Amino acid sequence: MDIILLERIPRLGQMGDIVSVKDGYARNFLLPQGKALRANEANKKHFEIQRAQLEARNLERKSEAEKIAEKLDGKSFIVVRSAGETGQLYGSVSTRDISEIITSEGFSIGRNQVELNHPIKTIGLHTIMLSLHPEVQISVIINVARSASEAQRQAEGETLTSAEAIYDVRKELLAENQEETFAENQQKALAKEMNDNDANSINEEA
């Protein structure tokens, strides 16, 4: 299908270019998202009439994207997920997860602006590209860890999937389990003591 580009599309062309693309790409992505028009005579005339307005709007959007890029480029975001000792996530981190965590920090980023070929499935520091505008791309760091403390260690350069780190994780898990067991035993002992006291009170009254 021949289309008229309404904005710059990487590896395809600039605004106003008439290019040929696969029908599915045009129908499912370019046309519904307002990035292109079918290249028929009516649309060609319409585009030429609207060209100045479209170019002005594009410059405005680019300027806004550049302002956001100044604050966002290179910024790090922490994502806490459950993972095994080797760092393999029990789930994954998707484009939706990334857009939501960045948006929660005060930046409006849609999932379609996150360039991620496959969901993240391991802990670690992951460099992710964001497309703020067809002509403005930046990168951010997604720090995926099992806890905030682990994220801090990763940010300081530690590799949490090393043998030493795995040993530390095991020790932390063991310590947590011991603390939980101790707390449970304390609660059981307290409950038993209260029950014994109640029984003694009943016997004394009798």
From Swiss-Prot:
Binds to the 23S rRNA. InterPro entries: Ribosomal_bL9, Ribosomal_bL9/RNase_H1_N, Ribosomal_bL9_bac/chp, Ribosomal_bL9_C, Ribosomal_bL9_C_sf, Ribosomal_bL9_N, Ribosomal_bL9_N_sf. GO terms for cellular component: ribonucleoprotein complex; ribosome. The keyword Repressor does not apply. Keywords: Ribonucleoprotein, Ribosomal protein, RNA-binding, rRNA-binding. The keyword RNA-binding applies. GO terms for biological process: translation. Belongs to the bacterial ribosomal protein bL9 family. It comes from Bartonella henselae (strain ATCC 49882 / DSM 28221 / CCUG 30454 / Houston 1). SUPFAM superfamilies: L9 N-domain-like (SSF55658), Ribosomal protein L9 C-domain (SSF55653). NCBIfam families: L9. Residues 197-206 have a biased composition (Polar residues). This is Large ribosomal subunit protein bL9. One of its GO terms (molecular function) is structural constituent of ribosome. Residues 182-206 are annotated as: Disordered.
